[in-house]
Amino acid sequence: MNLELLGHVELPENVKPGGFDHAAVHRASAKLYVAHTANDALDVIDCVHDRYSHSIQNLTGVAGALVSDEENLVFTSNRGENTIGIFAPDNEAGLAKVDVGIRPNGLAYDPGNGLLLAANVGDQGVPDSFTLSMVNALQHQMTSSIQVPGRTRWTVFDERAEVFYVNIADPGQILVVTSAEPTRVAQTIAIPAPGPHGLDLDPDRRRLFCACDAKQLVILEADSRETLKRIELSGSPDVIFFNRVLRHLYVAIGDPGVVEAFNTEDMRRLDTVQTEPGAHTLGFDAERNKLYAFLPKTHRAAVYADKG
């Protein structure tokens, strides 16, 4: 067993039906921020002591959290109010909101250019509402909107190539947007499995990991865009995280409620741990090799140590 259960962090009860979504860790303060969508709040966990700290309120339908350690910033995608939030970890009261497209979800950040991409899931009843919003994070201003062919999922930024990768659920694609020209889609990568959902990048070996609704994990070469391998999963995945030090990949699967861990050197499955039905999202503390699986029914986080 690679993933050892250390215990649980009790989180606030759900105010409305639902649960949690994307999470991110700020290294310097050892704070984990998780979108508690059911509560319109960002819950904050102390990763050193694995205990709940407090919640940041009034983030309607918050769906995602992203941290820039380089710029000391935290971003939120507030799907219920069509805004993104921006604040410094030591100044939560200074949280600023920027209007973006319809129902923002995925977030990725280019620290070199201060450019935030918000991937908007849109509304099927509103024509042309599947978009990407590009935001100047330092000036708190949306600078451009890019129409895309379908519902967006997660997104990541590749610092070496200076490009954003964005999953599109249908048609199954990864879109490429460059920092140099953040007003259009530069390239489209066809994905050989329906429903690209979770996405992460191995910046050293230049590989993209794309977890698809069709219970498949697709591995691509980031520069050539070629598909290298496809792996069957035990269910439809959502959030994934790549551990750059141990070179492990973690995949959250809400049904049946498991986390699968892979060795990315040979893509061998290392472990499968039971979480809870509906537990589709994770947080990863790279400093301590700890994984947090968010359990919606019992409103808590299961904490695992990756023993390598």
Residue ranges, per PLM feature:
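Predominantly soluble domains enriched in secretory-pathway, periplasmic, or organellar proteins
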Residues: 1-308
